[in-house]
Amino acid sequence: MQLAYFHVAADVPQGAEPDAAVVIDVLRATTTIAWALNNGAEAVETFADLDQLRQSAAQWPESSRLMLGERGGQRIEGFDLGNSPVAVVPEQVAGKRLFMSTTNGTRSLQRVRGVQRLFTLALPNRRAVADHLLMDPPEQLWIVGSGWEGAYSLEDSLAAGALADLLLNAAADEACVVNDELTAALALWQQWKHDPEACLRQASHGQRLIGLGDHDADFRCCAELDRLSVVPVQVKPGVLCAS
């Protein structure tokens, strides 16, 4: 299993495709996706374009859909929810299709949506995703961060290192790191693994969220390691369901 990490969607190689890909947006899209599916959402359908989201959502009955999204860390006007993992509680999302667009995470999902096996990862479902991959190891795995508006993000690299650490320890001689980005992410994980929430708060996007208001509950939720058993898997382009 060859493991590579790409900081943002634009870093993903053109004209190549791995056996599997994992998309990360720790603050907060992939954490919200994991919790929504864990709490009974029928599916999460992701969009980079807001007009396409609204058109697709309009085809569903209002009683069985929710529109989730943020731009610049704040909820999009007219949407039901923003991008907070603590808001997707069972009484809100159970049985519903969630139509979601975020500043960064949905762009990375769109970039690799053609990969045959596509998953999303957050710190709360890290072990679940690792175990799922190890049951049928891909020959080549791309880990794709979301960053912030095309730039590197500390928290996504932390999660990439956290996932790679599990895979490398479990697969022993059958897994290897193939780029420097993942080597750096592994070192970052070793530095912060005993206090991931502190890393999230120190990250520039963490500082951005702090500036927008009280997000303490979000930070705790996003940093909670290996809490969930849900594995979000793409079942058709842009549509994620629980596995």
UniProtKB/Swiss-Prot annotation:
InterPro entries linked: ComB-like, ComB-like_sf
One protein family per Pfam: 2-ph_phosp
Enzyme Commission identifier(s): 3.1.3.71
Magnesium among keywords: yes
Reaction(s) catalysed by this chain's protein: (2R)-O-phospho-3-sulfolactate + H2O = (2R)-3-sulfolactate + phosphate
Coiled-coil features, chain-numbered ranges: none
Keyword Lipid metabolism: no
Key words, A-Z: Hydrolase, Magnesium
Record-level Gene Ontology MF annotations: 2-phosphosulfolactate phosphatase activity; magnesium ion binding; sulfopyruvate decarboxylase activity
Enzyme category, top tier: hydrolase
Cofactor: Mg(2+)
HAMAP family xref list: ComB
Similarity remark: Belongs to the ComB family.
Protein name: Probable 2-phosphosulfolactate phosphatase
Originating species: Prochlorococcus marinus (strain MIT 9303)
Gene coding for it: comB
